[in-house]
């Protein structure tokens, strides 16, 4: 798995995985996903294909497409024939409804937990020994600290990163938005390069050796340590972070056109199964089934988490205020 992860780091951002299953497959699916779910879905796809074969006798081939969540959503809107999408945040799937009408408006109500079979959060990955003594978000705003994070215009994970830092400062200063914006501006003044997706930023930090601290998906941080060496990196858990809820959905019009609705729906539902939840936990995603929450409880650090609705009023409002053209990110980054 270590070799596979290193190879994935060097791969292109939008790559189709080799099909799973025999060449004479009865049905194929395309799962369009965000950047760091590659290893998760390699294992999950194998498990689902075996489950489906045992249940129906049919062979299912699952192909994967990965990249920054915003770019992935736009690819589906522009015609990429995804049977299902498993993206980093709800806004990008809302856009598939709003701009292409490929899914219903109420897509998020169709599966449990607002269609999020697993959750995650944002942590800080530093080099072994933590030479810059990073302890919390405020250390990222100090002069002389090089911070790696992707571009929130294209990456879903980067938007979670941005809001996690903003939310930390809001909680610290009693809700002053101007102080929060200035705090986040200082962090982005320390960012030397904005990659288009989370895996690209992992490559920048882990493989290229750029930066003192990487604002990272929790699962990506664990993967970097466990696959590339606990002697090279360590995780710093901030005092406050955001509960990230990556959602999934059937792409109705594509699935109906390709006559894959039944298997595509079963594929998503299997993410909530015992096997699906166990695979999520093994890949450092936080399961939502209480049985597997308990099983993997010792794996995950205790984090003081807030929800996007709590501080930002949900994704539609957050996107408009922070990441749309002229929003706070543009204001911050134009001053760099």
Predicted features and spans:
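Bacterial N-terminal signal peptides
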Residues: 8-19
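Short helix-loop capping/hinge motifs at secondary-structure junctions, enriched
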Residues: 129-135, 154, 167-175, 254-261
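Sec/Tat signal peptide C-region and signal peptidase I cleavage site
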Residues: 20-24
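A bilobed periplasmic-binding-protein/Venus flytrap-type ligand-binding module shared by bacterial periplasmic
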Residues: 122-130, 245-262, 279-283
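Extracellular/periplasmic juxtamembrane helices and adjacent flexible linkers that interface
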Residues: 255-336
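Ligand-binding pocket segment of bilobal, Venus flytrap-like solute-binding proteins
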Residues: 172-239
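N-terminal segment of the mature folded domain
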Residues: 25-155, 297, 330-334
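Short beta-strand->loop
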Residues: 32-34, 126-128, 146-173, 188-191, ...
